[in-house]
Swiss-Prot record:
Stretches that traverse the bilayer: none
Name under which the protein is recorded: Endonuclease NucS
Organism: Streptomyces griseus subsp. griseus (strain JCM 4626 / CBS 651.72 / NBRC 13350 / KCC S-0626 / ISP 5235)
Sequence similarity: Belongs to the NucS endonuclease family.
One of the record's GO cellular component terms: cytoplasm
Keyword field: Cytoplasm, DNA-binding, Endonuclease, Hydrolase, Nuclease
Function statement: Cleaves both 3' and 5' ssDNA extremities of branched DNA structures.
Presence of the UniProt keyword Cytoplasm in the record: yes
PANTHER family: ENDONUCLEASE NUCS
The organism's taxonomic lineage, starting at the top: Bacteria, Bacillati, Actinomycetota, Actinomycetes, Kitasatosporales
């Protein structure tokens, strides 16, 4: 993790153009290759960012104070440094990730046990499928043999869709798994999250936790 605090301006060139005028900002460069630019008044949300995979070149075009960040689609972030106030790097190592609350963990267990809830013919590959950026809740195959990555939440918001998007970008680089499609599953999915998921070709599934627990209870009573 590299943290840079600098007075800088930022220009984005891609599907549209955007400009951030000169101001003091925090720039985060993460080990996964992502670059994000933050102000002091937007909670955790960046002003602009570039998701991995992307490349960062410092001093592009012979200018020591210019950073150029380019993603695989050719979109660019050009960060013009006027004054660097802080620049430090820390090796954080592999994060263990969030420990799911009881409901999310139980949802994962129930869905893995009754994978046909996702559709007839689905088969489980494994729960907590490990990746370089954290475990995928459920990895399975559909009736056609296509790999499916499932992200589970109690309440599905945009952050969950973004998380699943990152997993899909990574998994689709594996020739043994690709093509991989995504399913965003939650007890409740917010409208904005559903719109974003649909735009990215990610399926949405609303889970009835009480009904799923009822399925489990019936199974236990049979034995």
């Amino acid at each position: 993790m590299r943290l840079v605090i600098a007075r800088c301006s930022v220009d984005y060139a891609g599907r549209l153009t955007a400009h951030l005028p000169s101001a003091p900002r925090l720039i985060l460069v993460k080990a996964d290759g992502s670059v994000s630019i933050h102000a002091d008044d937007r909670a955790y949300k960046p002003l602009n960012w570039m998701s991995p995979p992307c490349t960062l070149k410092e001093g592009a075009d012979g200018e020591a104070g210019v950073w150029t960040v380019v993603n695989k689609a050719g979109e660019k972030l050009i960060i013009t440094m006027e004054e660097v106030l802080h620049d430090s790097s820390y090796e954080l190592g592999v994060d263990p990730g969030l420990i799911k609350d009881g409901v999310e963990a139980h949802l994962q267990e129930l869905l893995a046990d009754r994978i046909e809830i996702l559709g007839e013919g689905h088969t489980l590959i494994r729960r907590e499928y490990p990746t370089a950026i954290g475990p995928v809740d459920i990895l399975c195959r559909d009736a056609n043999g296509q790999t499916v990555a499932v992200e589970l939440k109690r309440r599905g918001d945009i952050d969950g869709v973004e998380q699943l998007t990152r997993y899909l970008e990574l998994l689709n680089r594996d020739p043994h798994l690709a093509p991989v499609r995504g399913v965003f599953a939650a007890q409740e999915i917010k409208p904005q999250a559903r719109v974003l998921a649909t735009d990215r070709g990610i399926g949405c599934l609303v889970l009835d936790y009480d009904a799923m627990r009822g399925i489990e209870d019936d199974k236990l009573r049979l034995f």
